[in-house]
Amino acid sequence: MHHCKRYRSPEPDPYLSYRWKRRRSYSREHEGRLRYPSRREPPPRRSRSRSHDRLPYQRRYREHRDSDTYRCEDRSPSFGEDYYGSSRCHHRRRSREREPYRTRKHAHHCHKRRTRSCSSASSRSQQSSKRSSRSVEDDKEGHLVCRIGDWLQERYEIVGNLGEGTFGKVVECLDHARGKSQVALKIIRNVGKYREAARLEINVLKKIKEKDKENKFLCVLMSDWFNFHGHMCIAFELLGKNTFEFLKENNFQPYPLPHVRHMAYQLCHALRFLHENQLTHTDLKPENILFVNSEFETLYNEHKSCEEKSVKNTSIRVADFGSATFDHEHHTTIVATRHYRPPEVILELGWAQPCDVWSIGCILFEYYRGFTLFQTHENREHLVMMEKILGPIPSHMIHRTRKQKYFYKGGLVWDENSSDGRYVKENCKPLKSYMLQDTLEHVQLFDLMRRMLEFDPAQRITLAEALLHPFFAGLTPEERSFHTSRNPSR
């Protein structure tokens, strides 16, 4: 049974409320995104649009976003935002509200102009000096005002706009210090809280780069960073679309099973590397997984009597480390975007690396079916959906949680005759019921997902174990290799 589409109400910008409160790490509450492409009329009961806070950095950005974070229609992004995915907001699925916070400085000086300091040597050309002497202007919310043809640091020439979000904006640049290579440059708003959060993310990216000098572990790597008149700027290699963007533009036609298998293997490989280095991503979702190259071919699906896009190269990179948390850092209570949030986070039982494993299980289901497994925005409903799909929540987790308001005599308190109750009853079924074919490789995929979706994080499969799962036996030697020629460096 195909899930029907429900709209959700946005949640508060967690990037502001959580990560900002800690000195070394932060997390955001990313909420509900509408994944079902059929229904577009407003909901009869309540708004169900998700509030993420991320902005994809895409190379073919065409339309200006009108909201804060990454996607406009139903998904809303987060600070770390989908690094290279497109931010074509007017046709997106999430709605986001512009974060109202404004420093007193920006409230009184809406359009502040500063003279750009010229760091060039005396031998620099007159044209370069003219570029450097242009005034630096911020808009009333602290975004850098920049145009095509502007230069930053006399190194980065802006050649395109990739998107804009709560955190700032992303532009496509030519890096003249590296042979005019294309980069996505993330320009943070000139606001203290965002500047500090960017420094935290830079620290994580530095650690990843230090541990992965040969870039074998499929994480987007920072090639440069600098402070430009109060705007923290981070440069990344320009990649393709994120996996949600591709899914959306393909009318939510699921990825073929071989594609799911290869992407799953790469995800497990990348996240195992992070976990072995005492780092938890905490915000895994399709928007934060990017294709290296999202070129595709159009094929005709005789079974569905329609054309569909098939990506030519399923190599991916993991992005958005704005919420990544080291084991020794403070762990905020709430992490992960709603649809990929594990039960231990909802029940406030504490979390660690298994949090990422649950998120991967949800992502694989979405790749396989084209819609989210847990289409909700509210904790109680989320837990009920988990029980309908995965079975009862273990009693020891119920006894330990402080969220006793959700339970009575060891069971969830839930009105099945309410509109939400009817929705869950009609649209949620045991996990295996979603299997498209009863063949060995499909059975193996669902076995892997079920192990990733264990309620008890202590019983959840580790990523080292997942990489040995029989589902990956069908990979080719080429798909198992992770060679890359990328070598981003400052």
Swiss-Prot record:
Keyword Metal-binding annotated: no
Active site: 283
Record PTM Phosphoserine, positions in chain: 9, 49, 51, 67, 76, 78, 135
Compositionally biased tracts (Low complexity): 117-130
UniProt organism field: Bos taurus
Taxon lineage: Eukaryota, Metazoa, Chordata, Craniata, Vertebrata
One Gene Ontology molecular-function label: protein tyrosine kinase activity
Amino acids binding ATP: 162-170, 186
Basic residues bias: start-end ranges: 103-116
Pfam families to which the protein is assigned, alphabetical: Pkinase (PF00069)
Subcellular location, record wording: Nucleus; Cytoplasm; Cytoplasmic vesicle, Secretory vesicle, Acrosome
EC number: 2.7.12.1
Regulation: Leucettine L41 inhibits its kinase activity and affects the regulation of alternative splicing mediated by phosphorylation of SR proteins.
Domain of life: Eukaryota
Record's protein name: Dual specificity protein kinase CLK3
